[in-house]
Amino acid sequence: MVQHWTDIVFCHWRYEPDVVQRLLPAGVEVDTFDGSAWVGLIPFHMDGLGFPGLAPLPYVGSFPEVNVRTYVRAGNKRGVWFMSLDIDRWLPALVARLGYRIPYCVGDVRHIRLGDRVMSSVHRKWPSARYRSAELSVTVGERSDDDDLSRFLTARWGLVANPFRGRPVWAPVDHPAWSLHAATINELDAGVVAAAGLPYPNDEPHVLYSPGVPVRIGLPTLLTR
């Protein structure tokens, strides 16, 4: 599948590795930086979703998304592990759940940019969760220099998903290097992070913004045990 991720915000918190590991299945290990696991609240706008060489899918090919993710190792692969992905379209949510085994959710989702402000919100309707909402508003700053942490959090070339018959699912993710900017929080409600089974994050987050990148996601395969 090809797509374009636009106006993406990377909002991350440190967690103790064992707190995140207990939410992962056998065969999937939390990846760490500076001794910590990292969990992100990541809003963006998905545009141009479709198949290579064809026109983008009408209606279902463009929508806002807010996901909660961490970083893992499985076999000899390193990638993103999605704890939830909220969108406002039923069809792509169901297709992704079946085809890629990743936990898409459906509800009212908003993601807009006005000048240097980026604002996102989630009110989840399906499946139900104790904490079903999130709000995030940031002000975009100057271009940010690349460093080891920003590369750890953003330079990920695959996704790992729920095992099938005991083997984790892997799909390659290809995109250019991110153009990253500093960003400051104006408003934050991380309820969907708590809904994933984690303690509510109270520490100051690490925040970055990018105008976006074109993305190609390959077909899912099963990793060897």
What are these regions (language model features)?
Residues 8, 67-225:
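Internal, well-folded beta-alpha domain core
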Residues 1, 16-66:
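Glycine/small-residue-rich interface belts in oligomeric ring/scaffold proteins
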Residues 2-7:
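Terminal, regulation- and interaction-focused segments at domain boundaries
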